[in-house]
């Protein structure tokens, strides 16, 4: 659909604002059962599930960055002196759909997801071991993030020119 068209048209710095258009389209369609869903930290459920899931993902990515010899504070696109995880926030972007998919699964299997129950937390804590495809191989998400952060280090050091991302 239109997301693929926008993806092909994105230029450096995104002067045509394709990312924002794609995000609006994505959120409108991923939770289409929820009328007028708006993604936001303080928003209505399932924002609570997304917030928790992204916090877990961020921790996994920050750990991988440190293990690769990088500082999670020094971001590429994200810059904020009050955010100690700017680089983690940059690197985690291509992994967000894995969290989104898990949240959808939780929503389908749970009648009430307005609160983070013990059962829901247990499901969210599976994020590090979610099946991920990277380099045409299946591996746990935490291993895939290690491959991504290692490739970023190699880009910074001049050993390679492209980062390794998960396939969706």
What is each model feature region?
Residues 1-168:
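Active-site helix-to-loop segments that bind/position phosphate- or nucleotide-bearing substrates
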